[in-house]
């Protein structure tokens, strides 16, 4: 006699929980060379396309400390800005405050270029002459903020996003900027490209400040190793022991009632 359906269902559910608690993450890490190149290239591409042209737009380069801060915050899977951006030396040893842009979308459609395009396209709501914004413009103005010359980004797979109910299996993309932009002034000075540069080289209409001292290597406090488990993970952690207890209990009951029954593959 075989009694397998009930136990097979429990086993499959347990295996499903185990295997899908942390889906295979194909999104790049902050040390991925192509990801770094894509982030820097996309930012500089859009910074060189501003209209009217910018006379003082710096060419961005990667900052590992900003990327670590972005990663630490992205891992929380919360759709809101980092609460420590204005706290001195909390998220970066040099820049205070730190700028931040966030993009969240379905993981299967994520790309750095798509996210940057969405931010840059906010230019349609921004009037450069009056600094007025008819809708959302803050992501655009931070991307093209002339004096922001360092960027660090991270993307995190999130089963769910806090503050975005009903949104599942998302790519949560965060970019941090130093120094921060979005002050109550224009994001850049209009004029002949690079005419506002000092001794910097002019590359693709951007002032290349490669001689500027590099910020020190830094691991933000939020990135120190600590256990991490989102809401989906917590649910699975609770359900798996429950299924195990049910399986053991059911096995014991069946063995008591039918001592000669056995299971086989």
Label the predicted regions:
Residues 2-265:
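Mature extracellular or exoplasmic CAP/SCP-family domains and secreted bioactive peptides
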